[in-house]
């Protein structure tokens, strides 16, 4: 994973609640275990008509949202079945952060474990961001170090994140990387407490 410290990027909004993981990445695309190649299937049933032609009415297909790296959505984002493919698809598409009033717990944790930053903001703040996201080239800056989200027009909010998860994201580590960092201590512990016969 790459470290997440400060990110400034274009915002795309999907003003829908209860977007489930099957809408994020439909089940027929879950047959692979690589983390890449899922972006083209993100929101597949909404993005394409008959699986081929881009749907001009879907938010991410609008020209002003091309290149967006921050997604804003409504309540209960990522509900439904647990699948790591959902954050993989969002990342592979180009998103680095998701902002919503609430997330399904399992999806929220899957995002953090895979280096995608989920940010909870108050409903009225998300509504403001959804309105602003309809403007061409609307951008937000996210500072994980300061736990702040802000734009160039004076909007600024702080957000909460578990300190442990924050440190992993800042360093670009997953839990396997953390195990490697502590490997000498683990080996020493095993040597003291589990001697070989």
Curated annotation (Swiss-Prot):
Bilayer-crossing regions: none
HAMAP family tied to this protein: LeuD_type1
CDD domains (UniProt xref): IPMI_Swivel
Keyword Isomerase tagged: no
One Gene Ontology term, aspect cellular component: 3-isopropylmalate dehydratase complex
GO molecular function: 3-isopropylmalate dehydratase activity
Role noted for this protein: Catalyzes the isomerization between 2-isopropylmalate and 3-isopropylmalate, via the formation of 2-isopropylmaleate.
KW Transcription regulation (keyword) present: no
Catalytic activity: (2R,3S)-3-isopropylmalate = (2S)-2-isopropylmalate
Complexes and interactors: Heterodimer of LeuC and LeuD.
Alphabetical GO biological process terms: L-leucine biosynthetic process
Top-level taxon of origin: Bacteria
Pathway(s) served: Amino-acid biosynthesis; L-leucine biosynthesis; L-leucine from 3-methyl-2-oxobutanoate: step 2/4
Family, per entry: Belongs to the LeuD family. LeuD type 1 subfamily.
Entry protein name: 3-isopropylmalate dehydratase small subunit
Pfam families, alphabetized: Aconitase_C (PF00694)
Enzyme Commission no: 4.2.1.33
Organism for this UniProt entry: Geobacillus sp. (strain WCH70)
Record keywords: Amino-acid biosynthesis, Branched-chain amino acid biosynthesis, Leucine biosynthesis, Lyase
